[in-house]
Amino acid sequence: MKRWKAIWLVIIVALFCIAAQAQNQGQSVDAILDDSFRSMYNLQFDQALSKAEQAKQVDKTDPMPWVAQASAILFREFDRLHILRSDLFASDDAFSSRPAYSWVPASRKQFDDAIAGGEKIAQDRLNRDKKDVKALFALALFNGLRADDAALITKRNLTALSYTKSSTGYADKLLAIAPDYYDAYIATGMGKYLIGGKPAPVRWMLGTTPGFSEWKCEPLSSCHLRPPGPQ
């Protein structure tokens, strides 16, 4: 059961890495995405979606704005359903007894459309270049988003595990090409923990105020997460 409590971390952790990466790169699309993810973590979903749409217009061949869009829609639904309240993850019993929820139909369609649109862009990129790391990373994240939906909203545990395996598969392909693409280790490490039940050094604090404690994944000491803001 502990692995099911961890499944939601796959995409949430990876998305925070994207925000930090965007700030460091300083590129136009990435800078806009940085604003989008920060707005999302601050529960400013309209602003997050507006920034994601802006990034889509800057580069229509980049799947990452679609990741940001789908993420904001999913987090908005989490917030509406109070899914990320801390007591849900306080114990195995609390998590296993969680109910299955229903999406707002319009939001469900927005989420599915965002993922479908982004996956098409990513697959088109892979058709041109099988080693396109951005496409592989986006596909890993899209499957992670689907896993979070299945695990935390609709409570389809086996479906969530299937999406997690797919996410890990794309991340493994990426790392075979670019072993220094550290963000992808999050998906593989968490995925292998969920599938194999091996211990994972995960620390997470999630309360009423959006934010994160420092998170480190081994064996890569270079993979860190810190709260938003200047360091």
Tell what function each PLM region has.
Residues 1-8:
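Bacterial N-terminal signal peptides that target proteins for export
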Residues 8-17:
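Bacterial N-terminal signal peptides
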Residues 18-22:
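Sec/Tat signal peptide C-region and signal peptidase I cleavage site
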Residues 24-35, 39-51, 61, 72-131, ...:
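Short coil/linker segments at helix-helix boundaries
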Residues 64:
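Acidic donor-binding loop at a coil-to-helix junction in glycosyltransferase catalytic cores
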